[in-house]
C-alpha cells in the first residue's frame, strides 16, 4: 500500500510573508514530502522554488477564481495527500477614504482576505489528520476599526474571529488553528496599500521583518496557540485596545492624521 503524501499548502507564496513561510518551512520541516505553493505570479513562484530543498509543487492560480478552486479540490483528491499544514497568507489591503477607493478594489479585498481564505480552509480540512495545523494571516488591524483602512481592518477582524472560533471546534480532534496578527511588516504590502493613502509614521516605527513575523507564527502554531501578535510594539497595542475605549482610540488616530 502506497503511503499518503504529507504536504504543506501555502497561499500567497510568491512574495512577502507567504514567501518567507515557504523558506522557513523548507528548512524547519523534515517530515514533509512536498510543499505546495500557490500564487498568481508563476514567475515569482519559480524563483522561490529554485532555492528550496523540498520537493515543491507550484500552482499558479487566483484563489478568488471559483473554477480554479474546484480544480484545486480535485487535485487534492487525485494526489491522495494528508495536509499537515495550511498557511493562508494570500491577502492585500488598500488605504484611503472609503468613497475614494473603487468598489471593485474593495470587494476584491473581501474576496481575497475573507471568502478565498474561508474556501481554502473548507476545501483542505477533510484532508487533514490529527496534529495538522492551520495558520491564518490576520492583522493587528483586526483589534480596532481604522479610518482610511476601513474595509481591510474589517476583513482582518473576520479572519481573527473565524480562526479562533474554528480552533475551538477543531482542537478536540487534534487540529489547531492559529491567527497571526502582526502590525506593519517590511514587505511590498505597503507599496500596494499606499496607492491612495499614507501610513501613520508611528506605524512605520513599529515595523518588523517578515522573518520575525513568520518565526513567531510558526512557534505559536507549534505551541497550539489560537493567536499570536508578532513584535513587542503590537503586543502593547493589543493590550491598549483592551483598556482604552475604541471610540477614544479612533479619535486619537484621527487627530494624528491631521
List where the protein language model places each region.
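Residue(s) in the substrate-gating loop at a strand-loop-helix junction
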Residues: 139
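Active-site helix of classical SDR
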Residues: 121, 155
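Substrate-binding pocket helix/loop in short-chain dehydrogenase/reductase
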Residues: 97-98, 102-110
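Conserved glycine-rich Rossmann-like NAD(P)H-binding loop of the short-chain dehydrogenase/reductase
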Residues: 29-47
Amino acid at each position: 500500500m502506497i503511503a499518503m503524501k504529507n504536504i504543506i499548502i501555502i497561499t500567497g507564496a510568491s512574495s512577502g510573508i507567504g514567501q518567507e513561510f515557504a523558506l522557513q518551512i523548507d528548512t524547519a520541516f523534515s517530515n514533509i514530502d512536498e510543499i505546495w505553493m500557490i500564487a498568481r505570479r508563476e514567475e515569482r513562484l519559480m524563483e522561490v522554488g529554485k532555492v528550496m530543498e523540498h520537493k515543491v509543487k507550484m500552482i499558479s492560480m487566483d484563489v478568488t477564481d471559483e473554477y480554479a478552486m474546484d480544480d484545486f479540490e480535485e487535485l487534492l483528491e487525485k494526489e491522495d495527500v494528508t495536509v499537515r499544514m495550511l498557511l493562508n497568507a494570500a491577502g492585500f489591503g488598500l488605504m484611503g477614504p472609503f468613497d475614494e477607493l473603487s468598489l471593485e478594489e474593495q470587494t476584491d479585498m473581501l474576496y481575497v482576505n475573507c471568502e478565498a481564505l474561508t474556501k481554502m480552509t473548507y476545501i483542505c480540512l477533510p484532508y487533514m489528520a490529527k496534529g495538522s495545523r492551520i495558520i491564518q494571516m490576520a492583522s493587528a488591524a483586526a483589534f480596532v476599526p481604522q479610518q482610511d483602512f476601513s474595509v481591510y481592518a474589517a476583513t482582518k477582524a473576520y479572519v481573527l474571529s473565524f480562526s479562533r472560533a474554528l480552533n475551538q471546534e477543531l482542537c478536540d480532534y487534534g487540529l489547531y488553528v492559529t491567527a497571526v496578527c502582526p502590525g506593519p511588516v517590511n514587505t511590498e504590502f505597503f507599496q500596494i496599500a499606499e496607492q491612495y493613502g499614507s501610513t501613520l509614521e508611528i506605524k512605520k516605527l513599529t515595523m518588523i521583518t517578515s522573518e520575525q513575523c513568520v518565526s513567531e507564527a510558526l512557534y505559536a502554531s507549534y505551541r497550539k496557540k489560537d493567536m499570536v501578535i508578532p513584535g513587542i510594539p503590537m503586543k502593547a497595542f493589543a493590550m491598549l485596545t483592551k483598556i482604552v475605549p475604541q471610540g477614544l482610540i479612533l479619535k486619537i488616530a484621527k487627530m494624528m492624521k491631521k
